[in-house]
């Protein structure tokens, strides 16, 4: 870090302002001390103060104000951006019944794929020593065969090769094993629940369903994660970095869910089914055994009750204990269970909507995204997290393009990589809350162009969510922009950012022209690019009447056809479309967001149309279904139209021209008598070809040094000299 450069440039700010003005718009933890106190700001490191020894003397400032200027010059401001490819114009609510049911089903399937089926015919071997057998009633042990169970001696169990066996081995006391057999569990309360053979089996099966899922033959400490299977099954939904990551995002979320706690400090539980909670104790009565290089290890995770079949939260808790079964949980940061459980739900829901619902939301399940609400929430989360303040991360506001924007401020007396890693895990914990406003990826960009990306591992494809039909609904927003036009554009089969930008720009221009023609003076629309992102904002006169006219125009469909035609006619002539011939189709949907002014019902000028357009709440948005255009067909048609083809009739064919050219070349080589019909004379004896005479270097030297040559040279020199004299 170059402190002197930072101070001189002032990070693009006017350093002539007072220290209080410099810090007035920064929500930095701790307040600036007053002059009477003579204290420095809590964030000012002593090293920074010492680096500006003459600052107070040169400007006549007291030490606390000198420290304030040092503080201001030793921080970096970052603007939050949301890249177009990872942003969608639609999102979904948590309470959607269709999504809840699909997430529960998907989580249950994931658990089933990772474990054996705990069925009525599952083979169970009860490993008992002679002493342990006395803990059970004789009639219980004698009827084990009736319920697909049998007793096995510990020595016999340890000596067998059971790697391919589809049997669960149950110990009633912790065994002293050098090699754990596949699917080995310890249930210390078996005897207390063994009134009959049927009761014993029912107890064991119930415990297995509450324990971490494990496949048959699983003996090693780390056989793999649930997220590995998800990424392999749907590789197009994840980034290449995520596919190659050792611990994937879903695994991180589930592990943090397993270690989370509720508001009162207890372990994570299902709000709908409070009896289903995660239990992790060092002295657990039920656990699974695994092999490690340095010995045997036991899980200490189990659910306190069976998960409900139709509850996504119950199955998320089950997935959490399965994914975290290989980790020592004591050292992990424990976040709020409600926050992290919601994040896992939204993460799984994003996958489910894509793979099971074909990326289409029902009209009742569609909600609007909002940049401003998302930025405000992210800044609020940072403010309310003490760990961020300890790392020198705070929030503030900054003027960018004449607009006041919420920003993230990082002090430079802390490790930047540590700060970014802390922010990443914070956003990951709160993914559920943030995703409710559209978050999948964000970037932090400093005023000097420094870039940091925060991804949750999803590719851009997972954000291609559309609504089943054109809808008009309430727009929940915290934006200071009254009217927004957003597009979600994808190119098929490959992504091309240039074509996406070009299509959206031409659509926005066409929207302005066609709508102004349609309003015929009743209202006027002016569209322009929104500064700093890929959206468009527009101004419109008489918005109350205009919204209903827009709604009717969309319902009619004709005006959309005009907008589409005008935009595509301009788009197909662009260089971007002609340059990339891989792109065959383009699909886009749009959302129109408007903040309507309240209607005064006593005002006679307020029309009935405006009352209808209010929809009982302001503001409102209008969202479309996807439109698809075949760019390949348009490109081919344009080439045929613009191609000027002139047929040239040659006097001779190309074969004739080639033959004549060859004949001319042969004549140049062998003289005028040589033709194509001439053939080379065969040589009967290779030895008959005479060798060339030996080269005589002596004769050449004699020729060069002969008197005749010297005489001619002398005459030439005399002639040149005489010529010069005559001149």
From Swiss-Prot:
Chain segments carrying region Disordered: 1-38, 673-727
Biased composition (Polar residues): 17-38
Biased composition (Basic residues): 712-727
Top-level taxonomic group: Viruses
Protein name listed in UniProt: Non-structural protein 4
Source organism of this protein record: Rice dwarf virus (isolate Akita) (RDV)
Lineage: Viruses, Riboviria, Orthornavirae, Duplornaviricota, Resentoviricetes
């Amino acid at each position: 870090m170059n402190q002197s450069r930072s101070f001189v440039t002032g990070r693009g700010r006017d350093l002539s302002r007072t220290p209080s003005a410099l810090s007035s718009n920064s929500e930095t933890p701790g307040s600036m001390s007053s002059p009477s106190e003579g204290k420095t700001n809590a964030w000012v490191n002593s090293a920074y103060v010492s680096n500006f020894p003459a600052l107070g003397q040169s400007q006549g400032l007291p030490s606390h104000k000198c420290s304030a200027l040092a503080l201001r010059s030793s921080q970096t401001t970052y603007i939050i951006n949301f890249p177009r490819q990872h942003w969608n114009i639609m999102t979904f609510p948590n309470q959607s019944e269709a999504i809840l049911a699909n997430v529960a089903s998907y989580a249950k399937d994931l658990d089933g794929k990772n474990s054996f089926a705990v069925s009525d015919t599952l083979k169970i071997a009860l490993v008992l020593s002679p002493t342990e057998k006395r803990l059970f009633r004789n009639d219980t042990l004698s009827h084990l065969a009736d319920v697909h169970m049998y007793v096995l001696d510990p020595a016999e169990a340890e000596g067998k090769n059971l790697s391919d066996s589809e049997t669960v081995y149950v110990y009633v006391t912790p065994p002293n094993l050098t090699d754990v057999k596949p699917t080995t569990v310890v249930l210390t309360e078996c005897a207390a629940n063994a009134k009959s053979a049927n009761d014993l089996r029912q107890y064991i099966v119930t415990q297995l369903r509450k324990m971490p899922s494990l496949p048959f033959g699983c003996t090693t400490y780390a056989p793999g994660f649930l997220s590995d299977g998800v990424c392999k099954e749907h590789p197009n939904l994840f980034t290449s970095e995520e596919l190659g990551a050792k611990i994937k995002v879903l695994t991180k979320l589930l592990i943090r869910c397993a270690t989370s706690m509720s508001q009162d400090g207890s372990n994570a539980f299902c709000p709908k089914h409070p009896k289903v909670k995660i239990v992790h104790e060092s002295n657990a009565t039920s656990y699974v055994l695994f092999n490690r290089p340095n010995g045997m290890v036991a899980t200490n995770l189990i659910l306190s009750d069976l998960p409900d079949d139709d509850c996504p939260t119950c199955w998320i808790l089950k997935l959490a204990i399965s994914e975290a079964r290989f980790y020592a949980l004591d050292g992990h940061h424990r976040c709020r269970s409600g926050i992290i459980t919601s994040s896992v739900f939204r993460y799984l829901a994003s996958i489910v909507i894509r793979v099971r619902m074909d990326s289409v939301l029902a009209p009742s399940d569609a909600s609007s995204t909002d940049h401003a609400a998302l930025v405000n929430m992210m800044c609020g989360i940072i403010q309310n997290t003490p760990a961020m303040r300890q790392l020198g991360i705070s929030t503030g506001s900054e003027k960018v393009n004449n607009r006041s924007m919420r920003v993230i401020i990082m002090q430079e007396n802390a490790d930047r990589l540590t700060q970014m890693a802390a922010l990443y895990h914070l956003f990951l914990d709160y993914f559920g809350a943030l995703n409710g406003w559209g978050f999948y990826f964000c970037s932090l960009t400093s005023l000097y162009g420094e870039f940091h990306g925060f991804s949750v591992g999803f590719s851009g494809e997972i954000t291609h969510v559309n609504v089943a039909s054109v809808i008009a609904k309430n727009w929940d927003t915290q934006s200071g922009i009254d009217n927004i036009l957003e597009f979600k554009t994808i190119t098929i089969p490959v992504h091309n950012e240039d074509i996406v930008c070009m299509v959206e720009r031409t659509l926005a221009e066409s929207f302005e022209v066609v709508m102004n023609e349609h309003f015929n003076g009743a209202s006027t629309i002016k569209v322009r690019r929104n500064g700093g992102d890929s959206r468009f904002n527009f101004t419109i006169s008489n918005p109350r009447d205009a919204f209903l006219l827009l709604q009717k125009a969309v319902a009619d469909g004709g005006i959309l056809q005009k907008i589409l035609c005008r935009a595509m006619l301009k788009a197909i002539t662009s260089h971007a479309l002609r340059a990339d011939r891989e792109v065959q189709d383009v699909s886009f949907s749009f959302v129109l967001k408007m903040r309507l002014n309240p209607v005064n019902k006593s005002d006679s000028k307020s029309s009935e149309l405006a009352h209808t357009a209010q929809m009982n709440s302001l503001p409102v948005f209008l969202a479309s279904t996807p439109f698809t255009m075949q760019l390949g067909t348009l490109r081919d048609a344009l080439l045929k139209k613009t191609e000027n083809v002139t047929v040239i009739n040659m006097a001779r064919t190309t074969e004739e021209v080639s033959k004549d050219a060859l004949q001319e070349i042969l004549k140049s080589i062998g003289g005028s008598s040589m033709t194509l019909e001439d053939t080379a004379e065969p040589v009967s004896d290779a030895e008959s070809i005479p060798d060339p005479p030996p080269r005589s270097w002596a004769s050449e030297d004699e020729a060069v040094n002969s008197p005749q040559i010297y005489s001619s040279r002398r005459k030439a020199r005399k002639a040149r000299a005489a010529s010069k004299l005559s001149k």
